[in-house]
Amino acid sequence: MGIPLRIDARSTALVAVGGAVGAVLRYTVAQAIAGPLGTLAANAAGSLALGALAYEAAATDSVLSADAHTLLGTGCLSAFTTYSTFAVQTAGLAPRWMAANVATTYALGFAGVLVGRAIAATARGDRR
């Protein structure tokens, strides 16, 4: 499943360009929604998008090229989502909010992947 690993100048450039776009988008979200809620929003949205992208990548007749998957998945969405910020922000919360933030982040992350897959499946006309 997924895209085969390619380490060459082209795929490295695609990851760099996608990463730059994802980082700017992540920064924009952080400016619009400060603190743990902004991180939660970025991670949930990124999970949804990556769920759709991964579903599409797994299709034998994917409409996106391997380059597009590298640019969007490994580049853009990897830079957009952030586990390290989530961990640091969670550690700074009061204990009861720590548990709530962890539970909410994982619940929305998994739900986002499932919803993203469902959206991609519907767009493809799949019934799996």
From Swiss-Prot:
Keywords: Cell membrane, Ion channel, Ion transport, Membrane, Transmembrane, Transmembrane helix, Transport. It holds the Pfam family CRCB. It catalyses: fluoride(in) = fluoride(out). One of its GO terms (molecular function) is fluoride channel activity. It is a multi-pass membrane protein. Fluoride-specific ion channel. Important for reducing fluoride concentration in the cell, thus reducing its toxicity. The keyword Lipoprotein does not apply. It is found in: Cell membrane. GO terms for cellular component: plasma membrane. It comes from the Archaea. This is Fluoride-specific ion channel FluC 2. It comes from Halobacterium salinarum (strain ATCC 700922 / JCM 11081 / NRC-1) (Halobacterium halobium). InterPro entries: FluC. HAMAP family: FluC. The lineage of its organism: Archaea, Methanobacteriati, Methanobacteriota, Stenosarchaea group, Halobacteria. GO terms for biological process: cellular detoxification of fluoride; fluoride transmembrane transport. The gene is fluC2. Its main location: membrane. Belongs to the fluoride channel Fluc/FEX (TC 1.A.43) family. The chain crosses the membrane at residues 13-35, 40-59, 71-93, 97-119. The keyword Transmembrane helix applies.
